[in-house]
Structures are given as C-alpha cells and as structure tokens.
Amino acid sequence: STNVRVRVRDRFLNIRESSNIKFKNIDFSAGSINLRGSKYFTLEDCKFSFSSDMGLLGNSVAYSHFLKVRNCIFEYNNDGHSWSQQLSPHPVLENVLFRYNDWFGGTAWSPTTDRNYRGDSMVKAEAQGDQSWYGTQWRYITIENSYTAGIFAGPRSLIEYARLENLYEGCDCSGIQRNAAGARYSTTRFSWIINSPGLNGVRFDSKCGARFGDLHNVVSIGNRRGLRLK
C-alpha cells in the first residue's frame, strides 16, 4: 500500500528549562511534546494531530509560567490528553480548536490547565499570599465531535466565548467542569454547551465557606443535566 503511517515513538520533543521560545506554523503529527520549566513559551498557528494513542504519552506541560497557545488545532488524539498543563501560572489558550479526539468512554481526557499555582498546594499558596495562580485564561475555545469531556480550567480561571458541541463521553464529568477547587474565584461566561447527552453542561461545586465564582450568560442545550450546582 502507498497509504501507510508508521509510528515509531510517542514523544518526539522534550524541552526543559528553556525560556522565551516561539513555535509558529508547525504541524506536529504522530507524536507529542513535553515542556518542563520553560517560561514565556508560545505556540501559534500550530496543529497537533495523532499526538497520543493507547499506552502512549500525550502533550503535557509543567512548571512553565506564562505559556500561550494561540490559533492552534488539536485533533485525532486517542486515549490521552490533547493538552494537559499543570503547576504553571498564567497560561493563556486563545482561539483553539479541539476536535475528533478519543475513541473510548469513561476516561474524560479533557483539555486541562490545573494546579496553576506555585508550591505544593493551593492552601499553602494562599497562606503565603501567592498571587501567581490568578491568570488562567481560556478564550474563543471550540471542542467538538469528540469522545471526551470539555474544559477543566482549574482555580481562579476565566472561560469565555467557548463552544462545546457533540461530546459523547458519559463519565462523571462535564462540558465545563468546576469542581470544588476549580470553582474557586473563577469566571465562566458567554459560552455554549450543546448536545453532550452523557455529560453535565456545567458542574459548579460550592462549599459552606463559598467558592466566590461567577457564572453568567451560559447556554446549555441537549445535555444530561444543564447545570449541576452542588
């Protein structure tokens, strides 16, 4: 056959402790990237296809402050996160499309920016007056036609102008997931969650001491639950 794709490895790019780098207009196919301790990193006009598969590692980021992902596409990623960013203050994802991801149920594999603070825990960060985890932004995001959950944005994050449509996952997850930590000091606005029959449109957890999160101008249609407020 003349139409054969051979995959020889899972991760073809590791970058550590290297800052002020910009990748623009690059197609990453059949492999994933890993960033550690790389500050002020920008991905712009890039496409990530077939980044992960069964038993292979997906795209991941940790300890990389002020990372920006703009005008990018993540597609055909199976059994892994198309994008997972942890312990990295001030990430920005803007005008990003996630489509045709995952084949299996019960795994979620939502695009994620979580634990966006420095230090061992959010409680310790607050006690030390650490403001570094204020700045997560998800703006102009589309997630569609996938067997995944939606956005897991983390604490003190902003989600706005997001459209999530035709998500077929059925686990205990949501189009926009604001669990106890992720709801705290968050803002979710001007977003649409459409036709996710196995998911909550939005999950928003509260607590006796309150979460201080804002949720407004959100449309939820054709989902298992429109808004799950706990």
Cite the ranges covered by each PLM segment.
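Extracellular beta-strand-rich solenoid/capping regions of secreted or surface-exposed proteins
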Residues: 5-22, 30-40, 53-61, 80, ...
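Long, charge-dense partner-interaction scaffolds in eukaryotic RNA-expression machinery
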Residues: 108, 175-180
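A flexible loop/linker signature enriched in serine peptidases of the S9 family
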Residues: 170-172
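Active-site-proximal loop/turn and secondary-structure-junction residues that shape catalytic pockets
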Residues: 208
